[in-house]
Amino acid sequence: MTYNLNCDISNSFYRLAEVEVGKHLYWEIAGFKLHGQVFIVSWLVMLALIIFALNGTRKLNQIPSGIQNFMEYVYEFLQDIAKNQIGEEDYRPWVPYISTVFLFIFGANWAGALIPWKLIQLPEGELAAPTNDINVTVALALLTSISYFYAGISKKGISYFSRYVQPTPILLPINILEDFTKPLSLSFRLFGNVLADELVVSVFALLVPILIPLPVMTLGLFASSVQALIFSTLSAAYIGEALEDHGH
């Protein structure tokens, strides 16, 4: 009896520590193969954020307390990111986008770090943070690219593209290349950090007792939060750059 119990605990522990890279649960929809585990965890993260937002705004009081107070603090924090990077005049329309990006990445990273997804068996692949899939981080980076192009064109019209030849036409290739490197740096930075953190924790859990990786997991939670902050801050900075008046 004791032996069987120890075996069960040991098997659960090794499932937590197991490292799988490149395996996915594929859903085929209209001829396209989608990474099913990414959608599952993403939906759960979005559901948790929606429930949290509804609870925080259900009964608003003039003097905030409890979860409403926390929600207002988070909103002011995210509003400050947009204001500082985009500017007092133009930041308000972009607060929802910057907030959504930050909260999704933050929730996805923490879900991957805190929840023992590996104990849930799938036919193929495993549940994990959506942000450890390069497709997700590239999609988020492309959304930011579309956003700052939209911001610049909506404010300046076709004259927005004059920025590519400023301060001199010689810089045209470099300025064009810069717009390609922005989404690349955003996506690979987030993907690399999240994937590396999960691999490090898994390897430590495999090599040493379960309590030893806890400091590494704590560091991973901190790093995950920082990555959400970096991504949202850079997104706001790129949008602010697109809205900036280069003629002054």
Curated annotation (Swiss-Prot):
The keyword rRNA-binding does not apply. One of its GO terms (cellular component) is proton-transporting ATP synthase complex. It is a multi-pass membrane protein. PROSITE patterns: ATPASE_A. The keyword Plastid applies. One of its GO terms (molecular function) is proton-transporting ATP synthase activity, rotational mechanism. It is found in: Plastid, Chloroplast thylakoid membrane. NCBIfam families: ATP_synt_6_or_A (TIGR01131). This is ATP synthase subunit a, chloroplastic. It comes from Guillardia theta. The gene is atpI.
